[in-house]
Amino acid sequence: MASPHRLLKDYQQLLSLSQKILHLAVNGQWDTLVEQEIVYVQSVEGLVNTPIPDEIDSVMRLHLRQILQEVMDNEAKVKQLLQKRMDELSSLMGQSLKQKSINTTYNEFAGQRMLPGDALPDETRS
């Protein structure tokens, strides 16, 4: 069973990771965020498996609760930023697919007469 001091240190470390991840999301550093997310999840798993001792006083419990609330608030903000990024990427993918479709269509008609009397590209060289 973890000592109250060790438990507080672990919760503060989780909060620090949470703040770092939020900072990375705000600054659009997605690759680094993904790397840190692994460490964050491991930290959360470690805390989930660490029981809170019964002898922790109410002040310490309140402090731990406040830390957890801030971590959850940070997670909500990161989730919003991730959703915004996913929407941006989805839009970019849609634009890319439209551009590919347009390019494919133009390539299909390359070398063809589009209007009556138009010369083919090979006919203009004579």
From Swiss-Prot:
Keyword list, A-Z: Bacterial flagellum biogenesis, Chaperone, Cytoplasm, Repressor, Transcription, Transcription regulation
Q: Please name one Pfam family that this protein belongs to.
A: FliT
* Domain of life (superkingdom): Bacteria
Which BP terms from GO are recorded? bacterial-type flagellum organization; negative regulation of bacterial-type flagellum assembly; protein folding
Does Repressor show up as a keyword for this record? yes
Q: Where is this region: FliD binding?
A: 60-98
Region Required for homodimerization: list its residue ranges: 1-50
Q: How does it assemble?
A: Homodimer. Interacts with FliD and FlhC.
* Described purpose of this protein according to its UniProt entry: Dual-function protein that regulates the transcription of class 2 flagellar operons and that also acts as an export chaperone for the filament-capping protein FliD. As a transcriptional regulator, acts as an anti-FlhDC factor; it directly binds FlhC, thus inhibiting the binding of the FlhC/FlhD complex to class 2 promoters, resulting in decreased expression of class 2 flagellar operons. As a chaperone, effects FliD transition to the membrane by preventing its premature polymerization, and by directing it to the export apparatus.
* Name by which UniProt lists this protein: Flagellar protein FliT
